[in-house]
């Protein structure tokens, strides 16, 4: 009996250690190498297949300096205004999210920073639970410890979901505007950014009033967006 209890304790601990070692190894690799495909992309494409959707993956890696500053500012203004200065976590946002979750009785709001969103995109799925948020936090801490802000943002820009099968700034720019990501205007960048919280909803509701309103909000906030140091020169 005691041996069984030991195994019941040791097995999940071993899985946890192995998973985090795997993640850390990939984080080190991704400092210099572009991901072939993220866990979220794989999950999403499998979901489309199960739903009987004929969707092809459109994912085109683009270096950081070949992505429009307009898009960078729009995303920071919308998703994580304190990105340039925090260590991966927006504690005020997390506290607000916890309060909203308590009030609703469910894990809805996440208070996720760009770094946390990237952790989810690279290694996790879209399930919502406190265990998954804990995994996300651990990955975020590891990533922030060994990866500079420009690289974190570059990985994020290239892994965002924008439409059915469309991932990354370059694929989105080509899909919606038939131009490279480097040439996105402020208006185009704001429109793309407005889709980020719910890309598949807006894919099905392209004339949504919420999408127009969010675009205008992003446009107003872009001027005060603070980019990582290398983009401020």
Predicted regions located by residue number:
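Juxtamembrane regions of bacterial inner-membrane/periplasmic proteins
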Residues: 1-233
């Amino acid at each position: 009996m005691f041996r069984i209890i030991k195994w019941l304790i040791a097995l999940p601990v071993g899985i946890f250690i192995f998973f985090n070692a795997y993640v850390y190894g990939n984080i080190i690799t991704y400092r210099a190498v572009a991901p072939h495909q993220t866990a979220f992309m794989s999950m999403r494409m499998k979901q489309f297949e199960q739903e009987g959707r004929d969707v092809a993956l459109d994912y085109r890696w683009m270096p950081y300096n070949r992505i429009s500053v307009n898009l960078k500012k729009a995303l920071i203004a919308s998703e994580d205004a304190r990105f340039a200065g925090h260590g991966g976590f927006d504690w005020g946002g997390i506290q607000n999210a916890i309060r909203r979750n308590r009030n609703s009785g469910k894990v809805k709001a996440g208070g996720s920073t760009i770094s946390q969103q990237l952790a989810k995109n690279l290694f996790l799925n879209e399930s919502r639970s406190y265990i998954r948020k804990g995994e996300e936090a651990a990955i975020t801490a590891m990533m922030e410890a060994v990866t500079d802000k420009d690289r974190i943002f570059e990985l994020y820009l290239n892994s965002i979901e924008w439409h059915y099968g469309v991932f990354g700034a370059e694929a989105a720019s080509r899909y919606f505007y038939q131009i490279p990501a480097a040439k996105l205007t402020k208006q185009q960048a704001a429109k793309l950014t407005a889709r980020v919280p719910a890309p598949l909803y807006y894919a099905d509701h392209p004339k949504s009033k919420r999408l127009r309103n969010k675009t205008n909000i992003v446009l107003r906030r872009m001027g005060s967006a603070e980019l990582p140091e290398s983009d401020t020169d």
